[in-house]
């Protein structure tokens, strides 16, 4: 990036910071701040150990310096501006989850598709936070990173003093990688009527036993119930009976009688509903506990891809992490680091809603062809001298494929 381009970007960012609504963290004087400046480019030198005593001081600094990247600590410190970490005196830290396309298997290369995939993972994580962990919406701050993902900040006092090992355990739970499916399928002694109707399970010896799905109404148990019933519906939707339940047929205790009973359960009026809403598995299928656990174990990869949440473990485990500040700009894209209400996520489109610059025409010199979707437009930019809207110019320059203004010995705009 040449000096003229640097000056242009700084002026654009300064214009933003003049009126931007910056999401300053609570306990502002206890937060460390860090910055990367365009003047240091192409080196990404981080300037850290900075603190601010008041909102006005922080906002004046952002406007005056117009940094490329802005971070604050997720931790609270007694002395946030101390030069050595062991001198800061750690007081606690928010629980952070980072979802980024870099950490998703088989993430698409197309930026729009990549962001859509990350959004799906983010919605899954939101379900864990609200349902499994029971956090209130007031405890959760959701932020689009301005790049390729989202950040969750959990600010509940219950999590502030968690250490790295406890935070890693949370990541393990989210991933589901330590699940033992035998836990969910239990044979319990029963007292009461057989079949439908109310029952009380007392664990009394020598009573009849039945198979039930533990935790069917919440958490991983709910996900197991949904996966199992969806599988049964999909298999019974096949045209030929011989093609149904191929995974189960590989089990030595599954024969035609078992397959027939599974088909009857699926096609009955309340069979699948009883699994989802009551955890009922007492359908007269011999060895159902063993068969169900076998199927889930064989389907582990697909099950976890569908329901597990892929978060960046080092970020969550780090109790002294720096993270992007809501309302700032991402220096690698020029897009807004945007705070969202949880209800806004599903309809949020970063390629429109996080683009802050306008339509003013700007001349740039493009070093290689580049395609991107911004503001509802498919932009295909050819190499050479081009005139594009300012929002596209900022994005292309931040991505490193363009310089501001004309360059000699370049082809004219097409």
Curated annotation (Swiss-Prot):
One Gene Ontology biological process: DNA replication, synthesis of primer
Active site residues of this protein: 98, 100, 312
Keywords: DNA replication, DNA-directed RNA polymerase, Magnesium, Manganese, Metal-binding, Nucleotidyltransferase, Primosome, Transcription, Transferase
EC number: 2.7.7.-
Enzyme class: transferase
Cofactor(s), names only, from the UniProt record: Mg(2+); Mn(2+)
One annotated GO molecular function: DNA-directed RNA polymerase activity
GO cellular component, one term: primosome complex
InterPro entries listed in its UniProt record: DNA_primase_S, DNA_primase_ssu_euk/arc, DNA_primase_ssu_PriS
Origin: domain of life: Archaea
Function summary: Catalytic subunit of DNA primase, an RNA polymerase that catalyzes the synthesis of short RNA molecules used as primers for DNA polymerase during DNA replication. The small subunit contains the primase catalytic core and has DNA synthesis activity on its own. Binding to the large subunit stabilizes and modulates the activity, increasing the rate of DNA synthesis while decreasing the length of the DNA fragments, and conferring RNA synthesis capability. The DNA polymerase activity may enable DNA primase to also catalyze primer extension after primer synthesis. May also play a role in DNA repair.
HAMAP family (UniProt xref): DNA_primase_sml_arc
Family to which this protein belongs: Belongs to the eukaryotic-type primase small subunit family.
Summary of subunit composition and partner proteins: Heterodimer of a small subunit (PriS) and a large subunit (PriL).
Protein name listed in UniProt: DNA primase small subunit PriS
Gene it is expressed from: priS
